[in-house]
Amino acid sequence: MDKKYDITAVLNEDSSMTAISDQFQITLDARPKHTAKGFGPLAALLSGLAACELATANLMAPAKMITINKLLMNVTGSRSTNPTDGYFGLREINLHWEIHSPNSETEIKEFIDFVSKRCPAHNTLQGVSQLKINVNVTLVH
């Protein structure tokens, strides 16, 4: 079964954007931080990646016998604002997981690898670009 996604984005008079999906909406804004009304588009993309990774981990943990007491993720990305090769996209994404769990380090690392392969956002970004995605895990017992 194919899952479909439908998002409508509207440019507002103040140059912010409103994205609408189902009954939800989010304000995005590419202007400088001191005037912005929401995340920039790339920050929203990275937030979506983090949310997908966390949701996938939460869903898959019971089946993999992983106990999650607390789960956090920090995502950073980098791109050139004046590229010599004409590529303006993200060149690297770093995912830092912090997992509070009694499971072993080996179990957690295998689980995160499993999650990354099943997260649709991670798969999409990894599969269609030359983007390097680094994954780092901190286990807290």
Curated annotation (Swiss-Prot):
Transmembrane segments: none annotated. It is found in: Cytoplasm. Reduces organic and inorganic peroxide substrates. Protects the cell against oxidative stress. Homodimer. Belongs to the OsmC/Ohr family. This is Hydroperoxide reductase. Its main location: cytoplasm. The lineage of its organism: Bacteria, Bacillati, Mycoplasmatota, Mycoplasmoidales, Mycoplasmoidaceae. It comes from Mycoplasma pneumoniae (strain ATCC 29342 / M129 / Subtype 1). SUPFAM superfamilies: OsmC-like.
